Amino acid sequence: MKRIAIDAMGGDNAPKAIVEGVNQVIEAFSDIEIQLYGDQTKINSYLIQSDRVAIIHTDEKIMSDDEPAKAVRRKKKASMVLAAKAVKEGKADAIISAGNTGALLAVGLFVVGRIKGVDRPGLLSTIPTVTGLGFDMLDLGANAENTVKHLHQYAILGSFYAKNVRGIANPRVGLLNNGTEETKGDPLRKATYELLTADNTISFVGNVEARELMSGVADVIVSDGFTGNAVLKSIEGTGISIMGQLKQIINSGGIKTKIGASLLKSSLYEMKKTLDYSSAGGAVLFGLKAPVVKSHGSSDVKAIFSTIKQVRTMLDTNVVGQLVEEFAKETQVND
């Protein structure tokens, strides 16, 4: 049985979307037990009772505008902190939260703990593409500054995730850069390019420009956290703007526009479905001793369901256990 601890009070739509997502998961999968941390009265108002769902009551929660490290230190009984402690103490196998990203990174690092040999765990997310396959990208903001070693480890981590969780036999790894030529980029990117080229354990396809990301040029994209986060927000913003503009044009157009939109309705729906982030799951703080997954702050029921399903796959494949063994081998070699 897979035991998943969930911060029921994190996110814009908590606890409603969280609990309703749990209801769907319990119905869909018989091998999952859920621990919901938060206000019992509020949770119960949406929960379909099940012997595979436990509520751990707490009145305390970390707010979206709380200073992450300070909040984790001071709010010992916060729903997110208690969920992380359950993982550390072996009472749960993974944690999910749609709450404060910085706070989740803090509890991930300081409560759950990082795998020996991993210098800086990276925030990894599977981003949908027009091909329908998507790509894994890290780091998406766990670390504002990175070294060459960090980026090399992100390539290893990303490849490992793509193989074991997404089932890609030989994932192509690309380095996000300002040009495809090997001479492009700042010293960090140039040195990383050389290191990735020399590593025959990964399938490095070279530098990748941001404009190529959505075409599926690689299965794993490596970036420093600052740049990765900026690119992710740009992709999200562009998608929202395009869909909003399409809707405005259709609503304000004449009869010909509306007829055309009606004819294209199924195609537009398929495009939206292909690029829908809510079916891709959450962002994994990868490199920790257990799955720590951040669901989008505005997650709806579908996104919560997808995130729990994603964690189920991570536990099924024992990706973290395999990663611990992999880095233990590397540590022994380096020693």
Curated annotation (Swiss-Prot):
Gene Ontology process terms (BP): fatty acid biosynthetic process; phospholipid biosynthetic process
Subcellular location: Cytoplasm
EC number(s) reported in the record: 2.3.1.274
Catalytic activity: a fatty acyl-[ACP] + phosphate = an acyl phosphate + holo-[ACP]
Keyword Ribosomal protein on entry: no
Pathway where it operates: Lipid metabolism; phospholipid metabolism
Keywords noted in UniProt: Cytoplasm, Lipid biosynthesis, Lipid metabolism, Phospholipid biosynthesis, Phospholipid metabolism, Transferase
EC class of the enzyme, as a word: transferase
Main localization (coarse): cytoplasm
Pfam families: FA_synthesis
An example Gene Ontology molecular-function term: phosphate:acyl-[acyl carrier protein] acyltransferase activity
Gene Ontology CC terms: cytoplasm
Subunit relationships: Homodimer. Probably interacts with PlsY.
Function recorded in the entry: Catalyzes the reversible formation of acyl-phosphate (acyl-PO(4)) from acyl-[acyl-carrier-protein] (acyl-ACP). This enzyme utilizes acyl-ACP as fatty acyl donor, but not acyl-CoA.
Family: Belongs to the PlsX family.
Name this protein carries in UniProt: Phosphate acyltransferase
Organism annotation: Streptococcus pyogenes serotype M6 (strain ATCC BAA-946 / MGAS10394)
